[in-house]
UniProtKB/Swiss-Prot annotation:
Name of the protein in its database record: Zinc finger protein 668
Native organism taxonomy: Eukaryota, Metazoa, Chordata, Craniata, Vertebrata
Biased composition (Basic and acidic residues): 51-71
Organism from which the protein derives: Mus musculus
Subcellular localization: Nucleus
Entry keyword annotation includes Zinc-finger: yes
Amino acid sequence: MEVEATEARSPGPCYKRSGRRYKCLFCTKTFPNAPRAARHAATHTPTDCTEEVREAQPKVDTEPKAEEASGDKVSASVAKPRPYACPLCPKAYKTAPELRSHGRSHTGEKPFPCPECGRRFMQPVCLRVHLASHAGELPFRCTHCPKAYGTLSKLKIHQRGHTGERPYACPDCGKSFADPSVFRKHRRTHAGLRPYSCERCGKAYAELKDLRNHERSHTGERPFLCSECGKSFSRSSSLTCHQRIHAAQKPYRCPACGKGFTQLSSYQSHERTHSGEKPFLCPRCGRMFSDPSSFRRHQRAHEGVKPYRCEKCGKDFRQPADLAMHRRVHTGDRPFKCLQCDKTFVASWDLKRHALVHSGQRPFRCEECGRAFAERASLTKHSRMHSGERPFHCNACGKSFVVLSSLRKHERTHRSNETTGAAPQQELVLGLALPVGVVGEGSAAPVAGAGVGDAPAGLLGLPPESGGVVATQWQVVGMTVEHVECQDAGVGEAPSTLGDAGEVGGEETDEKPPQFVCRECKETFSTLTLLRRHERSHPELRPFPCTQCGKSFSDRAGLRKHSRTHSSVRPYSCSQCPKAFLSASDLRKHERTHPVPIGTPIPLEPLVALLGMPEEGSA
């Protein structure tokens, strides 16, 4: 008997008694009795039980009675064969009910509904735990936040989100997890077990429920509704995170700056902004990212994959969130509203950017000239004016540009010239005028051979008293480089009189192939601006009428801007005078009429270097 006991205990079952339950020493699962714990332990390979577990085995059971009573059953169950194999994955089971229960993880079947709320579950034990939440039986409460759970294991998993503990590390890729079920699901991805494929985009998943969640991104189904604001979601986890916003719960707080977050992933991405860590490296271009979502989005840009298509207009998108935002263009839904001027927005970041207009905050300041900006991206573009950096290069001719939009406009000229065989148009650099002192006191040096002496002041939106600053080689500095075409041939005859600077007017512009088609009458236009101007002649393309004067508009934004003319709302105020305006663009135009205070330092060296001009302008 002593030899048999030693033989039975020498391998050591990978479980121990913990209170009134039996706990697996490999994955921390618990079971109500020893036979069930033993059956579960057999699912782990012998290598799963480490030497430390085997050494601790003689101390596991402190109650000899339970060990004696279950010893024979344990050894018998471990040695029992597994004749019931899953056809979809390598797992095998001893009994048919166990195989049927496992099969639900593949089929997504949830035959156990909750009589209170209708939520369904795969296993009866999960339903029992859920019913305890309806009865208010949540004895395990988190010490970090107000959440409570029906089981101790769920509480421990939740608390790891606060402590950052992730004890389950993947041996293949090093990724770690707090939840053992998520860890097991991740291991399947390395095994290549993804039997469920999306018929639309081909993306494959290890479980059917994940495929069902993914399919909602194509169909637009959002069955999880917020009872507070009516917003709907495609996943229950997204609804849970959203509800924290209403409850003002931000359980994940940054110790460095105090900022709170509703999701652990958002908190972890934020932490990298302090450390500067960018662990996600693109193998194609070497660019690095701090969060996985930006990295995946960047990879799709390389692959050109846009699997999410709008069913109304056929436009494709890389992200389901981009598709959901695009759908609001068709529905007119603008859920984000400014509390100060009642302006509404399609996206939350548009509202945040708009809020800076009212607050006047411009936290991003240029170290060279002191100019401040509301957004970091605007400061980055502005800084290129000082550094001369032009990171966007044309592959056809080698020209470089400050911003991506200018490169795209320039590339259209190559596409049109390939069709007509015409030479590229001369580009004019327009935008920000240099101070009058560069070219003389209020006088403009005319461009040689050009009859455009009176044009620049009006073209640039400058006040008449500025004298219309123009100099040789177009001594005007531009934030972007754009093609300038005369839309009205009779005004000034500027394009046709440029002479050697490039014949951009006359017959050459007429020979351009049309690119933009009117959706109503099919008439074609060479530029988007001309198309939009033409579409105003079609009443059916202006479906948004003003209820007060009957004037109609092609989009809702135009109607909202027009409606302010009937009311006294002028949300954009000038900081230098009492005037207020209906739109931010009107305010910016007005601000140019205020003279720059004498003594304001304006660095000219980077601007001169950008244009390649001599330091002293010719008078």
